Amino acid sequence: MAKMNLSSYILILTFSLFSQGILLSASKSIRNLDDDMVFNTFRLGKGFQKEDTAEKSVIAPSLEQYKNDESSFMNEEENKVSKNTGSKHNFLNHGLPLNLAIKPYLALKGSVAFPAENGVQNTESTQEKREIGDEENSAKFPIGRRDFDMLRCMLGRVYRPCWQV
């Protein structure tokens, strides 16, 4: 009787392990189908363009170079020289590996990327002071410093009432 229970537990355990592997591979194939559908929707604009035009759509090339393969982002050149790093079903590591050569976000240009280059406008906003009038300390600190002091007071790290900040 004990052997029968033990063999049934082993049978259930092996079935659950194999079913997880099958479900994982099925979910990856479904995810690849969904990704292909998304890429195809962005490529629809290409069909309406002339074939002579060398200019491509802005959205399609940026999305085409990123493909999802075994939970990592690779462009086509890296996909050709990819190596087998072990088991395809790594159940312990579900995170994405870091690949610092690929930048999936767009680089900002001009004053949006570096707001400190705006010069006068930026310095005026940081040097702005609150004008309460009654408090003598209100003109000494910029807004950020006074807000930080108020937060410290509300957290109870300073031994004085909040209205004296």
From Swiss-Prot:
Belongs to the melanin-concentrating hormone family. This is Pro-MCH. Coiled coil: none annotated. InterPro entries: Prepro-melanin_conc_hormone (IPR005456). Keywords: Amidation, Cleavage on pair of basic residues, Developmental protein, Differentiation, Disulfide bond, Hormone, Neuropeptide, Secreted, Signal, Spermatogenesis. It comes from Homo sapiens (Human). GO terms for cellular component: extracellular region; nucleus; synapse. The modification Isoleucine amide is found at residue 143. Predominantly expressed in lateral hypothalamus, also detected in pallidum, neocortex and cerebellum. Also found in thymus, brown adipose tissue, duodenum and testis (spermatogonia, early spermatocytes and Sertoli cells). No expression in peripheral blood. In brain exclusively mature MCH and NEI peptides are present. In peripheral tissues a large product, encompassing the NEI and MCH domains of the precursor, is found predominantly. Differentially processed in the brain and in peripheral organs producing two neuropeptides; NEI and MCH. A third peptide, NGE, may also be produced. Preferential processing in neurons by prohormone convertase 2 (PC2) generates NEI. MCH is generated in neurons of the lateral hypothalmic area by several prohormone convertases including PC1/3, PC2 and PC5/6. MCH may act as a neurotransmitter or neuromodulator in a broad array of neuronal functions directed toward the regulation of goal-directed behavior, such as food intake, and general arousal. May also have a role in spermatocyte differentiation. One of its GO terms (biological process) is cell differentiation. Pfam families: Pro-MCH (PF05824). GO terms for molecular function: melanin-concentrating hormone activity; type 1 melanin-concentrating hormone receptor binding. Residues 1-21 form the signal peptide. It is found in: Secreted. Disulfide bonds join 153-162.
